[in-house]
């Protein structure tokens, strides 16, 4: 939904996903959309991919960090390696991406960094020990980026989604839920676009 929204609004969109297959459908459906296979948890791969994006599409005006890693379970159950991977995807990737995009945004005195998250960024819950800390760190990192880059023209915002997103697997998980129980991906995309341009 995010890719479709920004493409419809006239942006050339670079999409990043671990697997190429997830990107191909959107590339064939939309114009001015280019997919790049990359594991955002790998900083070397991410920097190389960002170089490709800049050479093919130019310097980004808006970054939406929507990747998510999760290791669910109690603090006694979670695998520390999977927890570290979730931290790399959720928090470290944001750090690396911000370092890559903000220099040109600051030079232009225009740009936006939007990060999607959820209420796990604000509170811990049972069985979220491998996820909530990574989202809290992500939110606090973005707040720090906002304080530092904001006065230089870069708008940074954390979009906390306190709802169940309407996806095939969530429909399956909540079979008896009514339509208005779910948050529509298009509504999230519209809000992210609005925030990026406020």
Regions found by a protein language model. Name each.
Residues 1-13:
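Canonical Rossmann dinucleotide-binding motif of NAD(H)/NADP(H)-dependent dehydrogenases/reductases
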Residues 151-164, 174-198:
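C-terminal helical subdomain
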